[in-house]
């Protein structure tokens, strides 16, 4: 279990520490804190990082994992996977100007972070096809949308900590809810006590009938936590 979680393009981070060999950074993200390979992140000043993370207009990825279009001109952003719930601002580009050698007429022009040769933060445009599953804002938090978003992952391989380009149970529910603007912690232990959720604890004093009554009150999209695992009620 070397890999515990995942970061996504555009995630703002605090770099808190560096390894002795300089190959790793200990970072704090909105969802998790862990060691990350230094080559996987770009370092910039606080104002620039936070401005990009909050800038509008933007697109929210509402599909499971759409990709940007292929381009030889900018291989760092060619067919880049963007996972559900990722929020990327639109680039301030002229609507008819070529982007990476392609006309942007049928695509959204995203302003994505890139890592320069010296490890510093930069930005470059990339095209996301308009047919891809994205939205101009977070989806409304409804039970119907929770089901629609959840089933977009149907058939995907399970991946502990987002290994195998998949996701585990807590990553799954985190990204479903994130597409509706609800930010949950990364792991089940923290999710189960998150103030973002209306929590009902089942303790040892409750008998079977009491537990059954609570189960019957559950609605679509509600989350059930047991040690090390989370499940979503679908009806």
Per-range role (PLM):
Residues 17-22, 93-97, 229-232:
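Short, charged beta-turn/beta-strand-edge "cap" motif at the junction between a beta-strand
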Residues 5-39, 177, 181-185:
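Secondary-structure-rich domain cores
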Residues 2-3, 76-78, 214:
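Short, conserved secondary-structure segments in the cores of folded domains
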Residues 96-203, 227:
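N-terminal capping segments
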Residues 8-13, 82-91, 218-224:
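Loop/turn positions that initiate beta-strands
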Residues 1-9, 28-67, 72-73, 84, ...:
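Boundary regions of SH3-family modules and the immediately adjacent low-complexity/disordered segments
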Residues 6, 185-235:
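...with weaker cross-activation on analogous glycine-rich loops/strands in unrelated enzymes
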């Amino acid at each position: 279990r070397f890999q515990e979680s995942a970061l996504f393009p555009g995630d703002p981070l605090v770099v808190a520490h560096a390894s002795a060999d300089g190959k790793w950074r200990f970072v704090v993200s909105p969802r998790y804190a862990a060691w990350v390979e230094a080559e996987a992140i770009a370092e910039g000043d606080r104002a620039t990082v936070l401005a990009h993370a909050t800038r509008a207009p933007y697109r929210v990825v509402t599909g499971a994992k759409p990709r940007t279009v292929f381009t030889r001109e900018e291989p760092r952003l060619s067919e880049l996977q963007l996972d559900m719930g990722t929020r990327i601002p639109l680039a301030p580009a002229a609507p008819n100007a070529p982007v990476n050698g392609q006309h942007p007429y049928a695509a959204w022009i995203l302003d994505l972070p890139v890592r320069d040769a010296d490890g510093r933060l930069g930005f470059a445009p990339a095209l996301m096809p308009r047919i891809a599953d994205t939205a101009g804002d977070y989806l409304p938090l409804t039970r119907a949308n929770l089901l629609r978003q959840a089933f977009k992952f149907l058939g995907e391989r399970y991946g502990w900590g987002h290994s195998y380009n998949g996701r585990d149970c807590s990553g799954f529910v985190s990204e479903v809810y994130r597409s509706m603007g609800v930010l949950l912690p990364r792991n089940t232990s923290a999710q189960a006590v998150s103030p973002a959720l209306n929590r009902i604890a089942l303790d040892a004093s409750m008998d079977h009938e009491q537990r059954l009554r609570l189960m019957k009150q559950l609605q679509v999209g509600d989350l059930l936590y047991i040690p090390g695992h989370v499940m979503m009620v679908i009806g």
